[in-house]
Design a protein with these regions (language model features):
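Amphipathic alpha-helical segments of tetratricopeptide repeats
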Residues: 58-65, 100-105, 139-145, 179-188, ...
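Amphipathic alpha-helical protein-protein interaction segments
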Residues: 326, 330, 334-337, 341, ...
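Catalytic cores of enzymes
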Residues: 528-910
Length: 910
């Protein structure tokens, strides 16, 4: 495919080629150039004609450089074509020299710069120099829109796609492949070779994210195209291997020509190893090493040799040769890391800017850590796990979309668990050291990393140019979110395809903007910095009566870390599966209790107290304010609903103030408690007087916001448009409305506003739209709608809920509901919350006191089903100083007059 694009290159550049030096020498060089150029453009070129063309261009370049004709158009174009011929012949090192020579002459023609950057970026990719490839390709991408150069744009996007796939970002890679294929299909002449190559790449990106059947369907359609059949065979084998159908994988691998693709020997070795045939595995591995430079037209590069060593390490490990396995995996690390060269099994890379194939390097580091662990060399295992996790965080931060980041987290959580287990074992062997703190920090660094990274970027205060780019990034995130929402209800395949193409284009532009931002050194430091608060930092954020309680579920154990001002304690709760079943049973009881029904916690409540509450109480040392960082299913549990003692006669809410965090890292830098903010609440009650669309009336919602200072929107005025226009004008936002949370499709979760005449999407605020907003000026959002804390549970990231979306957007804290709420009970609790908040209480204490007021009232229903659904997540501090409460007294009288103490009639929200 490489030579086909060169004809289009001639159309762009050769009109100015004849502007070479004048006189007899110049005429002679032009004649020689034209002779070489005619050979260069032959429809059926051969090695001989390419060799003659290369000699001609080389002679022209040498004479012009000798004559000092720097920057001459004839010189730069001849040098470029020399590079292209070397590139096509597989001489990437000399091709790179030629391309860099062109750029070194600083040609004035931007189209020549664009084309050369595409080629030099591609040749750096072929040399496995991924950082340099990325540098030139991204520079070319910034110029691509200025030229109608389809073929080189296809080459650009295809190479960028391959680059991202090789670094594990398969979703972004597919975006580029799809974009390139769209360009090919839109051309006046259809380039079959290019189209087939791109479809192979698209299928490969698909099976790498688990879409095996989709990938195989594409490959089967391409089997008839003979020139690339070996690549189809290879990738079909890899897809079957991904499905763990190793006999079928081997059948396809055996069809591949070793002369064309010698690297397939690695995949054959791996398949044999999975089939427990170690002798065959060793034979294939050694066969690839024997081929080496004699592999014919197929290239064996550092990536192939690294993979060979990686598979070899596992084969040696299975034979019991751990020393040999460590030696081989270290060789793989050296090859994958690029600029790292340490032969001993104790060296680990500390920086990753020169590495390529990040996910391969990550796998190799994990393998090495596991080998050290198996040998009980725990210090070496811990050091290697630390390097692997640093790389993992680097990879995650390099991804442009949260979808890609969450995919990575779902597939790498086990490594954090293994590292934590090693650290805890080291603490057991060496008590009094810092291993317990390191174990705690391993868990905390894994939690809410997507939210944390976004908030750090939002808080970036750099140059005005960088801040402007950040604004564009937010805009594109919002556009992508809107497209995700639009796609949810689309059934027409052509419309869905159009939305998909638009989204892919926006994601490519989002990535380009983020790479442009990374040119700002301070922004790069903020984005990729791996620092996180230590124990002393967190202790400085805690009050004397506070305990930070962090849960980490892994390996059949619930690890409970309790941080107070005077220390760090760890409790391991065994039988995690039983504990999780009890939590789920407790939640079912909370959601199922009917009006007037007596809540019966029974044996489940007793077990939860003994296994969960009591150990925390003991580790907290009598402290009565807990800041809980949950994990897994525990993120859905309102701890205040649990028993406070073994008798079950007291709820935890009666003894303990509780709030929640997505990560302890979000404690640092929070606004100081007690510092007053501007007064006023932005409140919405779209269904106070009447229902609309599919949503029923919520009569108590109007009373819920009645008398609040600030701006109130009721019924038909409570629109999504008004919310977006006014959301950052008040420190508190109160949404008394309906909401829908999806447990298996986060994109379908939304908050309902009053339906206008527009499309449904214009009347609902979807979860992904919230991701694109900047809500940093907002200190508290109260969402009294039901189930706004529900969603898919992603280990170490939390519940993908509407409440999390507000935190992601920068809101300081949220009060949300975990299940279908009683309308009247919710209204009273929130009225009392405002009353305590205006007296200067912290948000956490105000919510606790409001629930206690409810329990002391004459309400009929006092089970936790009616008050435990409301939970506070985020900054728990006060919004108002205690001296600023006088104004609120007047407001409180107005609230009482408008709403009074309501009767408790059962009205559930949907």
């Amino acid at each position: 495919m490489g030579r086909v694009a060169l004809l289009f290159l001639g159309l762009l550049l050769f009109g100015s080629v004849l502007a070479g030096p004048g006189g007899p020498v110049g005429d002679r060089l032009l004649v020689r150039y034209r002779r070489a150029d005619s050979l260069f453009h032959l429809d059926r070129s051969t090695r001989v004609t390419d060799s003659l063309a290369l000699a001609g261009f080389t002679a022209v370049v040498n004479e012009l450089e000798k004559a000092g004709a720097r920057g001459d158009t004839l010189l730069t174009v001849a040098l470029l074509k020399r590079g292209i011929l070397l590139d096509a012949g597989g001489d990437y090192a000399r091709a790179r020299t030629a391309y860099c020579g062109v750029l070194g002459y600083r040609p004035a023609d931007d189209s020549l710069v664009f084309v050369t950057q595409v080629y030099v970026g591609t040749v750096y990719y072929n040399l496995d120099r991924f950082d340099s490839a990325s540098y030139f390709l991204l520079r070319a991408e910034s110029l691509a829109g200025r030229f109608n150069d389809r073929d080189n744009s296809v080459r650009l996007y295809n190479t960028l796609g391959a680059l991202y796939c090789d670094n594990g970002n398969f979703r972004q890679g597919r975006n580029y492949f799809d974009h390139a294929l769209e360009l090919v299909r839109g051309g006046k002449t259809y380039d079959t070779a290019a189209a087939v190559s791109l479809q192979i790449n698209i299928a490969t990106a698909s099976f790498r994210v688990g879409q095996y059947e989709d990938a195989l369907a594409i490959y089967r359609q391409l089997l008839g195209y003979r020139p690339l059949r070996d690549y189809v065979y290879e990738n079909m084998g890899r897809a079957y291997a991904g499905m763990e159908d190793y006999p079928s994988a081997l059948a396809w691998f055996r069809r591949v020509s070793l002369r064309e693709i010698p690297r397939v020997l690695n995949e054959m070795a791996n398949a044999e190893l999975r089939l427990n045939r170690p002798d065959s595995c060793r034979w294939y591995l050694s066969r690839l090493r024997e081929l080496g430079p004699s592999a014919g037209s197929g290239k064996i590069g550092p990536l192939d040799l690294g993979l060979n060593a990686f598979y070899g390490s596992e084969e040696l490990s299975r034979r019991g040769d751990v020393g040999g396995a460590l030696k081989e995996v270290q060789r793989a690390i050296d090859l994958f890391a690029g600029n790292f060269n340490k032969r001993d099994a104790y060296g680990n890379p500390v920086g990753f800017s020169g590495a390529f194939a990040y996910y391969r390097l990550f796998d190799a580091l994990v393998r090495k850590a596991e080998l050290h662990n198996g040998e009980k060399n725990l210090e070496a295992s811990y050091a290697t796990y630390s390097a692997a996790l640093s790389l993992l965080r680097y990879i995650e931060r390099s991804y442009a979309t949260d979808e890609a980041k969450l995919f990575l987290k779902k597939n790498s959580g086990i490594v954090y668990a293994e590292a934590l287990a090693v650290c805890l074992e080291l603490d057991r062997r060496h008590p009094g050291g810092d291993y317990l703190e390191q174990a705690f920090l391993i868990g905390e660094r894994s939690k809410a990393s997507v939210i944390t990274a976004n908030l750090e970027e939002k808080a970036f205060m750099g140059a005005p140019e960088a801040k402007g780019l950040l604004g564009q990034v937010d805009n594109y995130k919002y556009r992508i979110a809107r497209l995700n929402v639009r796609s949810e209800g689309v059934t027409d395949s052509s419309e869905l395809a159009a939305i998909t193409r638009e989204k892919e284009g926006d994601e490519i532009e989002l990535l380009r903007l983020q790479k442009a931002l990374e040119q700002d050194g301070e922004y790069y430091r903020v984005k990729y910095g791996d620092a996180s608060p230590g124990i002393r930092d967190l202790q400085g954020e805690l009050g004397r009566n506070q305990a930070l309680v962090s849960l980490y579920a892994a390996g059949g154990v619930l690890h409970v870390f309790v941080v107070t001002r005077d220390g760090l304690r760890h409790v391991a709760v065994d039988s995690l599966a039983r504990l999780e079943r009890d939590v789920e049973a407790w939640l079912e009881k909370l959601k199922a209790t009917g009006s007037g029904g007596r809540f019966n916690g029974g044996a489940v409540g007793q077990r939860l107290f003994a296994a969960l509450v009591k150990p925390i109480q003991e580790a907290a040392g009598g402290r009565t304010e807990w800041v809980i960082v949950p994990d897994g299913v525990f993120a859905l549990l309102p701890f205040e609903s649990l028993y406070a003692d073994a008798t079950g006669n007291q709820w935890l809410v009666e003894t303990t103030t509780i709030s929640y965090r997505f990560s302890s890292r979000l404690l640092s830098g929070e606004p100081s408690s007690g510092k007053s903010v501007g007064s006023g609440v932005l409140s919405f009650a779209p269904f106070g007087d009447r229902g609309a669309d599919v949503f029923q009336r919520l009569p108590a919602s109007k009373e819920e916001i009645a008398g609040l200072p600030g701006l109130q929107w009721l019924d038909g005025q409570a629109t999504k448009e008004r919310f977006l226009a006014t959301v950052n004008q008040y420190p508190i936002v109160h949404l008394a409305t309906h909401a829908v949370s999806s447990m298996d499709n986060a994109a379908g979760s939304f908050i309902a506003f009053y339906p206008g005449k527009g499309r449904t999407i214009d009347n609902r605020l979807y979860l992904e739209e919230l991701y694109g907003l900047n809500l940093q000026p907002t200190r508290l959002v109260i969402i009294s709608a039901c189930e706004t804390g529900q969603g898919e549970v992603v280990p170490q990231e939390g519940v993908i809920s509407l409440a999390r979306a507000f935190a992601y957007a920068g809101c300081g804290s949220t009060i949300n509901s975990l299940w279908k709420a009683d309308d009247q009970a919710t209204s009273l609790i929130l009225k009392r919350f405002y009353a305590h908040l205006r007296e200067g209480e912290t948000k956490a204490r105000a919510l606790q006191l409001a629930k206690l007021d409810y329990l002391k009232s004459d309400a009929i229903d006092k089970s936790p089903s009616f008050w435990a659904h409301l939970v506070l997540t985020g900054d728990s501090g006060a919004l108002y100083s205690r001296r600023g409460w006088v104004l609120w007294v007047v407001i409180g009288l107005a609230v009482m007059g408008a709403g009074g103490i309501v009767l408790f009639l059962k009205r559930r929200r949907v």
